[in-house]
A protein has these predicted regions:
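Short, basic/glycine-rich phosphate-binding loops at helix/coil junctions
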Residues: 182-184, 221-222
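Pocket-edge positions in alpha/beta enzyme catalytic cores
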Residues: 57, 69, 96, 192-196, ...
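Catalytic core of nucleotidyl cyclases, primarily class III adenylyl/guanylyl cyclases
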Residues: 186-188
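C-terminal substrate-binding subdomain of Rossmann-fold SDR/epimerase-dehydratase oxidoreductases
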Residues: 201-339
């Protein structure tokens, strides 16, 4: 089986490529390297001992996609490519809608014309409405998103759902991620954000190593046990395994399916800081900063459907997540730039 992975040089994409290659699948990656590095692909090959085929291009390049589908016998697609910073999306909404929505439409058009009918879409817990009770189920209310990034994921989900109605021979799996952290246990690949991190774990690890002076904790007056925001953190390798499980399911089940990929347990920002310090015997200085607009007090998944239908559940512990994040950071203090 050959899998086309858009955004395969990125954080989640590269770890998923490792899992796909180790399961014996062939992998073709398309990535424009706007927020990723080709070094990730070289290290994926180093980890697995297997090659991947890489096309550097934007997924919105229809002629480029036609070339890929002509040159490679693609069986299914995992669509990671897109802009992904929640805060930045509020400052650059047009770019986010153009990139995330546009790439999805162009990709589906190319798939349709080349007879490829199986796609896994990299969605997000941000599609859920902010007024849901916890935990979040696949049937919880969506829409009423709190930022443009979430809306782009919501719109892309709807595009794919509408297309399955128009052509029921398609298999579409929407995977709603919660908060991926951690890195491959080898320390060879991990999360390498450009500029100041948007996600908590690279912010913690870059502060611990001295690349950043202090961690900003956005708000300590939420209705949570310690006043800081609670999220469902999941090891990126668990997330990668979820995609392999979804490929197997998708091959036998046409139509649309939705699955949460989370642990079902939430941790606060301060709990994460203390867990990281304990796991790695380091100090993480932090300061309390004002709340960020759109941040919810508590978000965590109910992953029962994924366990029941996909046979998937998170296996890595919080200590594993913290340890692997730190291993990546210490092996690559400046990310892939040190290569």
């Amino acid at each position: 089986m050959t899998v086309l992975v858009t955004g395969g040089m990125g954080y989640i994409g590269s770890h998923t490529c490792v899992e796909l290659l180790e399961q014996g699948m062939d992998v073709v990656v398309v990535d424009n390297l706007v927020n990723s590095s080709a070094e990730a692909g070289r290290r994926v090959e180093q980890i697995t001992g297997r090659p991947l085929k890489f096309y550097q291009m934007d997924v919105r390049d229809r002629a480029g996609l036609d070339r890929i589908f002509t040159e490679q016998k693609i069986d299914c697609v995992i669509h990671f490519a897109g802009l992904k910073a929640v805060g930045e999306s509020g400052q650059m909404p047009l770019e986010y809608y153009d990139n995330n929505r546009g790439s999805t439409i162009t990709l589906c058009e190319a798939m349709r014309d080349h007879g490829v009918r199986q796609i896994i879409f990299s969605s997000s817990a941000t599609v859920y409405s902010g007024d849901n009770e916890m935990p979040l189920y696949e049937t919880s209310r969506t829409g009423n998103c709190t930022n443009p990034y979430g809306w782009t994921k919501y719109v892309c989900e709807q595009i794919l759902r509408d297309y399955v109605v128009a052509d029921p021979s398609w298999s579409v799996v929407l995977l709603r991620y919660f908060n991926p952290i951690g890195a491959h246990p080898s320390g060879l690949i991990g999360e390498d954000p450009r500029g100041v991190p948007n996600n908590l774990m690279p912010y913690i690890s870059q502060t611990a190593i001295g690349r950043l002076k202090c961690l900003s904790v956005f708000g300590d007056d939420y209705d949570t046990p310690d006043g800081t925001g609670v999220r469902d953190y999941i090891h990126v390798m668990d997330l990668a395994r979820g995609h392999v499980a979804a490929i197997a399911y998708m091959a036998e089940h046409p139509g649309e399916s939705i699955f949460n990929l989370g642990t079902g347990k939430g941790y606060s920002v301060l709990e994460m800081v203390h867990a990281f310090e304990t796991a790695n015997h380091v100090h993480v200085p932090y300061r309390i900063a004002p709340r960020r607009a759109g941040d919810l007090p508590t978000v965590y998944a109910c992953p029962d459907k994924s366990a029941r239908i996909l046979g998937w559940h998170a296996e890595y512990s919080l200590e594993d997540m913290c340890r692997d994040s730190w291993h990546w950071q210490t092996q690559n203090p400046n990310g892939y730039e040190t290569a």
